[in-house]
Amino acid sequence: MIYNIVIYFVLWGIAIASLFNEKVRKMWRGEREAFKILKQKVDPNAKYIWFHAASLGEFEQGRPLMERIRKDYPQYKILLTFYSPSGYEVRKNYEGADIICYMPVDTRLNAIRFLRLVRPVMAFFIKYEFWSNFLHILKYRNIPTYSVSSIFREDQVFFKWYGRSYAGVLKCFTRFFVQNEESKRLLEGIGITAVDVVGDTRFDRVLQIKEAAKHLPICEAFRTGVASSQSADVPHHDFKVF
């Protein structure tokens, strides 16, 4: 409840700031146009895998996995969303995704509308992306949802006595692929055990550029993680070679 009240205040703040700041104006316009883009481009007969990155740095962290999926599973389409203009404006013509747009503001209504329209079979949130309404509705709809290259610190609200209610947002994820052992320890401390330590996927991108990467650690962990976490309420998807 408090989160949703804050979101609406943030929404009004963005609207006002957009009158004076070009970057904020682009973000505000892009978020409002997201549904228009999706209505025009979503193929109702296709199966989409959704990647969300806040900005350019997070995009680079998710890019190795995105490109591996596109190569090995061409039957799936890729939807890529950004929060920041610094990501969207640079990568809006990226050929590795079928649809690219801003992520709508995290209201419950937007989340419901977005997921009904896209109907993703799987979702990946890169690093620090913990949007409560989207994540809770993804969980409600039994859509496997993964946090990639996430990293946690002990001073974050999730791990404080007063923030345990917000830690429920983290429990919406099917599995975490974290950067270090400390992040795994912190998550396990609040009862989240579906965690793999895979490092920073940006290093895979560097190796990929140098043509030295033959395997992506996150893909191997993903394959193992999905195999060990299948249950009756989690749809199975044919990602067998990860």
Regions from the PLM with identified roles:
Residues 2-6, 10-17, 21:
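Membrane-interacting alpha-helical segments
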Residues 15, 19-212, 217, 224, ...:
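Active-site and donor-binding regions of nucleotide-sugar-utilizing enzymes
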Residues 230, 236-237:
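Low-complexity, intrinsically disordered or signal/transmembrane-proximal segments
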